[in-house]
């Protein structure tokens, strides 16, 4: 009862993390909203397959978000970390680390809640230790869909919903009892923290989240008439039953509320 899971527990974000992967890839120039990738029930690499569910193919970014296509985001992640401009996969992962940190992952957000955890974002040094320095993109591919070594607190994942709703920035989460005018608020409480991704790249991601709820996709059960909900589902493997995650905000334009659930 003393363990506050919202800030202390660490869970793989699952497919909700695909939103971050798409944003980073667009900023790095290896993905555009209209690029289409084929999916034949999964992504094949090194004699293995990262499975996916049955859906239409090929998909552009918006539909890949709506349908939560594993193959699409595996390819996007590979293209990002193997970009020749980095010189090596190790350096590609290092650049990826910096982007992910800018979304508030892998570090404490600085809330008022006691015992806040930092979660985990795997680094090249982590993989060097795990694989004795011998690893490639296939070794880290599970991170493309928010599994593997990725670990986030529920608050960090809720913060991701706020970042996307705001098209690229967040405020440090705080507990508030009452507010009496902006002048009474400490300036720290309305300081914006921007990600490394330009706001224009959030547009197709938001559209994909909206389609997934309101048109066709894995988030259809979150539909609420008149609310224009945007959402993204996630499932992550676990030693026991799978973890299920869901993040959302509403309405699509000028959002007023976001939420995150972990089951």
Walk through the language-model features, giving the residues of each.
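Beta-lactam-recognizing serine transpeptidase/beta-lactamase-like catalytic domain environment
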Residues: 1-15, 20-258
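Conserved small/polar residues in nucleotide/adenosyl-binding loops
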Residues: 262
């Amino acid at each position: 009862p003393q363990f506050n899971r919202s800030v202390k527990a660490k869970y793989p974000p699952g497919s909700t993390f695909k939103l971050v992967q798409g944003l980073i890839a667009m900023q790095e120039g290896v993905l555009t909203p209209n690029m289409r990738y084929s999916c034949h029930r999964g992504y094949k690499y090194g004699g293995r397959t990262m499975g996916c569910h049955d859906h239409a193919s090929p998909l552009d970014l918006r539909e890949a978000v709506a349908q939560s296509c594993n193959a699409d985001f595996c390819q996007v992640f590979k293209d990002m970390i193997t970009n020749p401009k980095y010189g090596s996969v190790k350096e590609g992962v290092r650049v990826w680390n910096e982007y992910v940190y800018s979304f508030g992952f892998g570090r404490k957000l600085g809330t008022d809640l006691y015992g806040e955890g930092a979660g985990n974002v795997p680094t090249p040094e982590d993989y060097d230790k795990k694989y004795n320095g011998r690893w490639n993109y296939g070794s880290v591919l599970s991170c493309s869909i928010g599994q593997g070594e990725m670990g986030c607190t529920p608050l960090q994942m809720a913060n991701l919903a706020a970042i996307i709703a705001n098209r690229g920035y967040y405020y440090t989460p705080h507990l508030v009892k009452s507010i009496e005018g902006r002048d009474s608020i400490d300036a720290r409480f309305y300081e914006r923290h921007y990600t490394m991704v330009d706001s224009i790249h959030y547009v197709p991601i938001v559209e994909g989240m909206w389609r997934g709820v309101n048109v066709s996709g894995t988030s259809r059960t979150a539909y609420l008439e008149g609310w224009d909900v945007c959402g993204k589902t996630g499932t992550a493997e676990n030693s026991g039953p799978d973890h299920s995650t869901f993040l959302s905000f509403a309405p699509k334009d000028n959002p007023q509320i976001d939420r995150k659930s972990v089951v």
